[in-house]
Amino acid sequence: MAVTFYDLSSEAGLEKLDEYLLSRSYISGYQASKDDLAVHAALAKPPSSKYVNVSRWYNHVEALLRISGVSAEGCGVTVEGSSVATPPVADTKASAAEDDDDDDVDLFGEETEEEKKASEERAAAVKASGKKKESGKSSVLLDVKPWDDETDMTKLEEAVRSIKMDGLLWGASKLVAVGYGIKKLQIMLTIVDDLVSVDDLVEDYLTAEPANEYIQSCDIVAFNKI
């Protein structure tokens, strides 16, 4: 179902978008799509931190564009009062190639005291209104390290993505050189906090049989509530 937003250059437009994203990670569906690119392109500049949900979503889309691009079609979105130009997928992939040499990727940024306070106030408002609060979600950036330079990284990533469980969604990934011909897999994932424990995911699945044929160890690079 198509979504329409109005004049995202105005405070009223940003407030509506912020309210819309209060209970959503993306504009439509459960992964970034061209709908997110359309709304992202309609914003002339990064949103103020007072729009907590818009800022969180904007930073997440920026990170995806840096490392892999967005290709999902989405459900359709219209932004009235703005000139929207959705970036082509090829351009985002080119940008990702330029960033392949970066070992450290700051996907989420630090949450400010102002953002924390605003989040708490919104949660209190939802509770006071009698609405059922959705289970929290988190975005995680994981480093997955192979045994040596002879490890087949394609099979390593296949082993990672073969792990399925309720509340777990694998996202964008890239290979990052660490030296001596060895590369590590850097991969994003979204989890439902009540259903998935990252520690259990690493210990019981990623570094256990059969995945440990390719995976030596895993490190949590970034963990952000969304």
Swiss-Prot record:
SMART domains: EF1_GNE. Transmembrane segments: none annotated. SUPFAM superfamilies: eEF-1beta-like, GST C-terminal domain-like. Residues 97-113 have a biased composition (Acidic residues). The keyword Transport does not apply. Pfam families: EF1_GNE. One of its GO terms (cellular component) is eukaryotic translation elongation factor 1 complex. InterPro entries: eEF-1beta-like_sf, EF1B_bsu/dsu, EF1B_bsu/dsu_GNE, Glutathione-S-Trfase_C_sf, Transl_elong_EF1B/ribsomal_bS6, Transl_elong_EF1B_B/D_CS. Residues 114-124 have a biased composition (Basic and acidic residues). Residues 82-131 are annotated as: Disordered. Keywords: Elongation factor, Protein biosynthesis. GO terms for molecular function: guanyl-nucleotide exchange factor activity; translation elongation factor activity. EF-1 is composed of 4 subunits: alpha, beta (1B-alpha=beta'), delta (1B-beta), and gamma (1B-gamma). Belongs to the EF-1-beta/EF-1-delta family. EF-1-beta and EF-1-beta' stimulate the exchange of GDP bound to EF-1-alpha to GTP. This is Elongation factor 1-delta. It comes from Spuriopimpinella brachycarpa.
